[in-house]
């Protein structure tokens, strides 16, 4: 009996020490347009490794699909690293993609806009199917927000469709439209969807709440 108690004590002691000393920090990969690349998230204490090498303010959904499909390589610290390697070696994945797609169409013309949105959604599903080949503690897809004084129905439809396919893969869809819609205090300027520091800070708070327990 004493041996059993001693073994139990040793086990509990080891378990406690492990939990106290275990590294709780996370590695985070952000890909897509500039909305995903959040300076406040980068400097947060729960993230010890932050990679933003596949961020480009001009990326569209098809760009990311092709980058992953053809396993594009970039140079990091004088070494070539493929997108597949980065996708394999991170705890958290954050994606923001499609803002360029939708605003390009709105600024061009709105003819057949719902067909265009459905094509966006289909492309996003192709992208998420590629992402689903990898394992993460958390995948967050950043939703779309309306900076115009119109098109509310379009953004409602777009977010609804994107959230449905995100849920299909059991990923988290970050709905920002209610927070950022027609709110110039979060934007660099009212004619562009790019965020200012206040906007990034607001989004980082939401994301940290969603990943802090991993």
Predicted features, each with a name:
Residues 30, 49, 63, 112-115, ...:
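Extracytoplasmic/secreted proteins, especially bacterial periplasmic and envelope-associated proteins
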Residues 31-32, 142:
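Short hydrophobic segments within beta-strands
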Residues 5-17:
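Hydrophobic membrane-insertion alpha-helices, especially the h-region
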Residues 52-53, 138, 170-172:
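Conserved beta-strand segments of alpha/beta enzyme cores
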Residues 25-29, 35-119, 194:
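Conserved SGNH/GDSL esterase-like catalytic core that processes O-acyl groups on lipids
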Residues 145-214:
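Catalytic His-Asp segment of secreted/periplasmic serine-dependent ester chemistry enzymes
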Residues 17-24:
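Sec-dependent signal peptide cleavage junction
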Residues 96-102, 128-157:
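Active-site segments of SGNH/GDSL-like serine hydrolases
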């Amino acid at each position: 009996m004493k041996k059993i108690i001693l073994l139990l004590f040793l086990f509990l002691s080891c378990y406690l020490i492990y939990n106290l000393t275990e590294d709780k920090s996370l590695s985070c990969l952000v890909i897509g347009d500039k909305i995903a690349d959040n300076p406040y998230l980068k400097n947060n204490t729960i993230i010890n490794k932050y990679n933003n090498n596949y961020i480009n303010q001009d990326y569209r959904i098809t760009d990311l699909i092709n980058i992953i499909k053809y396993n594009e390589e970039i140079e990091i610290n004088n070494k070539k690293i493929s997108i597949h390697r980065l996708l394999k070696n991170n705890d958290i994945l954050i994606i923001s993609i499609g803002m360029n797609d939708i605003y390009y169409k709105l600024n061009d013309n709105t003819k057949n806009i719902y067909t265009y949105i459905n094509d966006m959604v289909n492309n996003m599903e192709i992208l998420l199917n590629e992402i689903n080949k990898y394992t993460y503690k958390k995948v967050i897809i950043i939703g779309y927000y309306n900076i115009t004084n119109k098109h509310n129905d379009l953004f409602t439809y777009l977010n609804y469709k994107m959230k449905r396919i995100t849920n299909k893969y059991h990923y988290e869809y970050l709905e920002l439209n209610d927070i950022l819609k027609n709110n110039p205090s979060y934007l660099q300027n009212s004619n562009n969807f790019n965020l200012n520091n206040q906007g990034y800070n607001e989004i980082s708070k939401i994301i940290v709440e969603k990943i802090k327990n991993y």
